[in-house]
A protein has these predicted regions:
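Short, hydrophobic alpha-helical packing/hinge segments within bilobed ligand-binding/sensory domains
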Residues: 28-29, 37, 47-48, 78, ...
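Ligand-site clamp/hinge motif
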Residues: 4-50
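Detector for C-terminal structural segments
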Residues: 3, 68, 92-122, 164-173, ...
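Structural transition elements
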Residues: 83, 109-142, 158-167
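Immediate post-signal peptide segment of exported/extracytoplasmic ligand-binding proteins
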Residues: 11-15, 85, 133-152
């Protein structure tokens, strides 16, 4: 990338940026330490720990607005048993949210519901004591599955801020085995069919992520029944017209107090019900050369090149 001489904002003293694809965190750590690169993204906790002692490296830690979630299709044709509302409640109760945060790394949060921590109207985080295996087993029995069931989960080869979705899926599989649900994980490349199936609403059970297009809670309204993401889970507005109506209420609210109230109502409605379980609000870790200034985490585009200067 080369500097635009006609850029309307404040100019930096950097004329060219070279972007390199280095999927391996250890490779990034080594090339940053030796000065071959100046900024590294999507680092693991282990590589961050090693870089912490490097005198020529500075680390920026934070929490993004990107979320990882479990999706259970409401259409029984695709979701099978996970389309059952009581099964969905059981799965919520069975997940080990603190264990998921350990996999994702330092800075990970578990949002209370569908609105990320840090957004207007957010109700904060889901308490760790929400997990209850005995309650989950009872809910599963009430749903007609006292002995559990087998279910397929299709997961893509993507990652969320360096966290492999397959790793999150494996954790979900392990957690659900505690209540008798046997998950068979199949990995499919995004370009090889997963992407189309996800968008078309034909995936039955999956773990996916969602990044915000703009920093406002309205971006999360697409998870409501009838919304863009809601329909990917086979969740139509007709299935829950009261909750679906809150979409427009939130979009049209001009008073902050009224808007906050609608957003809180949405979160409460989706706290224990619905086809989506937000399992993690992703952390972000950026390591950069100490010769740079202005390197920081930005929700919408990870890093803002227009803020970076060489000291």
């Amino acid at each position: 990338l080369e500097k635009n001489p006609n850029y309307w904002g404040t100019s930096t003293n950097v004329d060219k940026y070279i972007l390199k694809i280095q999927p391996d965190a250890n490779t990034q750590m080594m090339t940053l330490s030796t000065g071959d690169i100046d900024v590294a993204l999507n680092l693991t906790d282990d590589t961050l720990e090693e870089l912490g002692s490097a005198e020529n490296v500075e680390i920026v830690n934070g929490t993004t607005k990107m979320i990882g979630f479990v999706m259970m299709n409401m259409n029984e044709e695709y979701g099978g048993p996970v389309s059952n509302p009581d099964v969905q409640k059981a799965i919520r109760k069975a997940l080990d949210y603190s264990g998921i945060r350990m996999i994702c790394g330092e800075g990970t949060l578990t949002p209370y519901s569908i609105i990320q921590d840090g957004f207007m109207g957010s109700k904060g985080i889901r308490p760790d004591d929400y997990t209850n295996i005995e309650e989950a087993k009872q809910l599963l029995a009430e749903a007609g599955y006292p002995n559990g069931f087998d279910v397929d989960m299709t997961v893509s080869d993507l990652d969320m801020e360096g966290i492999l979705l397959t790793d999150l899926a494996q954790k979900v599989k392990d957690d659900l085995s505690q209540i008798g649900i046997n998950v068979n994980i199949t990995t499919e490349a995004w370009a090889a069919g997963y992407g189309d199936a996800y968008r078309n609403g034909t995936l039955g059970f999956t773990v996916m992520y969602w990044g915000v297009d703009y920093s406002d809670p309205n971006v999360q309204l697409e998870f409501l029944p009838g919304g863009t993401v809601g329909k990917r889970a086979g969740w139509t507005a007709e299935m829950d017209p009261e909750l679906a109506a809150m979409y427009q209420e939130a979009m049209e609210a001009t008073d902050n107090d009224a808007r906050t109230q609608v957003l809180e109502n949405i979160q409460d409605a989706m706290y224990e019900d619905g086809p989506f379980i937000v399992i993690a609000q992703a952390p972000a870790h950026i390591a950069h050369s100490t010769r740079l200034d202005g390197v920081d985490i930005f929700d919408s585009y990870t890093i803002d090149f227009t803020e970076i200067n060489v000291k």
